[in-house]
Amino acid sequence: MGRSISVSFGLLVVFLSLSGTGADQDCLPGWSSHEGHCYKVFNLNKTWEDAKKFCTEQANSGHLVSIDSKKEANFVAELVSQNIKETRRTDFVWIGLRAEDKRQHCSSEWSDGSSINYQNWIEAESKKCLGLEKQTRYRKWVNLNCGQPYRFTCEI
């Protein structure tokens, strides 16, 4: 019995080492894992509302990415940079933050309902939706026209 437990444990160690940390196994194929969440950059051009809807259709708890820390912001920026190769000088990627009132102030929560704990936006003319800008290597948030089609990142 002791030998059986050792062999089973040994196989588990080999399996986990072959599959990385084991965290990726919870993500759908083509998605990337980071601190218990899964992310995917979509090279489809959609308006903010259509991108939000598309993300909710990907999985039960899917939503446009909400960025809660500098560490997560860096992860998302790298993921976007790796997955969007063909870009224009002024290229943008939707995130899940949108202004909800007439004065263009951001709502107090992300599109998934979570609170805004981290902020990294560029002051600019008032638009309603926020995205990542290529000129900042996808690290700063910029105000954009919600009706313009851009690529986007979903999180589950």
UniProtKB/Swiss-Prot annotation:
GO terms for molecular function: toxin activity. Expressed by the venom gland. Residues 1-23 form the signal peptide. Residues 34-155 form the C-type lectin domain. Keywords: Disulfide bond, Glycoprotein, Hemostasis impairing toxin, Secreted, Signal, Toxin. Gene3D superfamilies: Mannose-Binding Protein A, subunit A (3.10.100.10). The keyword Disulfide bond applies. Transmembrane segments: none annotated. One of its GO terms (cellular component) is extracellular region. It is found in: Secreted. Belongs to the snaclec family. Interferes with one step of hemostasis (modulation of platelet aggregation, or coagulation cascade, for example). This is Snaclec A4.
